[in-house]
Amino acid sequence: MTSDDTAQPSGARRIETRPDLTAAQKDAVLALLDEAAQVDGQQAVSEQGRLQLRGGPREGVRHLLLSVGEDLVGYAQLEDNDPVEAPAAELVVHPSHRGHGHGRALGSALLAESGKRLRVWAHGGHSAARHLAQVLGLTLFRELRQMRRSLTDFDPAEPVLPEGVTVRAFVPGEDDAAWLAANAEAFAHHPEQGSLTQRDLDDRKGEPWFDPAGFFLAFRGEELVGFHWTKAHAAEQLGEVYVVGVRPGAQGGGLGKALTTIGLRHLAAQGLPTAMLYVDADNKAAVTVYERLGFVTYETDLMYRSET
């Protein structure tokens, strides 16, 4: 279906909402995202959002395509899978077509599609995105920090694991179910991460960057109690603390710090000069741990929401 069913003359703005995209539409969206990223310095749509462009329809996911004439000039993705929070969205307008109200049109369409219950990411927190949020009547409620540190001088003490805990690399296929269960427990308070499914895991295992040698699992006996999944961004020469998780029963004993150190040592050994990670600004304990490991804030992503 479309959010504007009225026939319009060539050159008029048109927004179409779809549960899935054709191959040609996916290619056009990916090209739009890449061209915008070259100008903005970061992707307007998260890794999860880009993965959701692949395969077939995704439950709870809708795609909004904004065209002018035959040209795709804007894109938004709306995901409504959180049982508590409002639907979440990301949107982008091609740099050559900004300043013509397309962002406001996409934002208004998202509000209509979501029943005016909406959360929207502004990656990098650019002033134009902040202005658009204000125009749409959205308020800031979440800050996600990207933190970085140099790995060229990274020389930590040997990580100390809690008694009875051993660490080994992830084995694809064999460890999938155990990791998904541990991830769900470790991030029960964080649905974006804790709700990952086998399909989500398979998507990531199919990415060129996936390397099980950098996916560390901590066991106490046969129980998976913690993990650190690292990610190498080869083109940017960045190593990422992709996700660190510790099951509730194993928290408080230093396992998270030990796993973080193990992963950072692995990234440094790959010759990557810089490490990065994402952490919610209001997670004071985690921010403190990372600051003690030498991380500093590099940039901040902002999430806005409607008050309806």
Swiss-Prot record:
The protein's matches in PROSITE patterns, at most eight in alphabetical order, are given as:
GNAT
**Keyword terms of this UniProt record:** Acyltransferase, Repeat, Transferase
CDD domains the record matches: NAT_SF (cd04301)
> Which Pfam family, giving just one, matches this sequence?
Acetyltransf_1
- Please tell me which top-level EC class this enzyme sits in: transferase
| Domain of life from the UniProt record | Bacteria
A GO molecular function term, named singly, is: mycothiol synthase activity
Q: Where is this region: Disordered?
A: 1-20
- Per the UniProt record, which EC number(s) apply here? 2.3.1.189
Q: Which InterPro entries match?
A: Acyl_CoA_acyltransferase, Bact_Acetyltransf, GNAT_dom, Mycothiol_AcTrfase
Q: Which reaction does it catalyse?
A: 1D-myo-inositol 2-(L-cysteinylamino)-2-deoxy-alpha-D-glucopyranoside + acetyl-CoA = mycothiol + CoA + H(+)
Residues annotated as binding 1D-myo-inositol 2-(L-cysteinylamino)-2-deoxy-alpha-D-glucopyranoside are 47, 192, 231, 240, 278
Where does the record place the N-acetyltransferase domain? 15-152, 165-308
Task: Detail which positions bind acetyl-CoA 1.
Answer: 91-93
Q: Which biological process annotations from GO are given for this protein? A: mycothiol biosynthetic process
Q: Which residues bind acetyl-CoA 2 per the record?
A: 244-246, 251-257
Give the multimer and partner information.
Answer: Monomer.
Q: Which family does it belong to?
A: Belongs to the acetyltransferase family. MshD subfamily.
Q: Explain the purpose of this protein.
A: Catalyzes the transfer of acetyl from acetyl-CoA to desacetylmycothiol (Cys-GlcN-Ins) to form mycothiol.
User: What is the protein's name according to its record?
Assistant: Mycothiol acetyltransferase
Record the organism. Answer: Streptomyces scabiei (strain 87.22)
- Upper lineage: Bacteria, Bacillati, Actinomycetota, Actinomycetes, Kitasatosporales
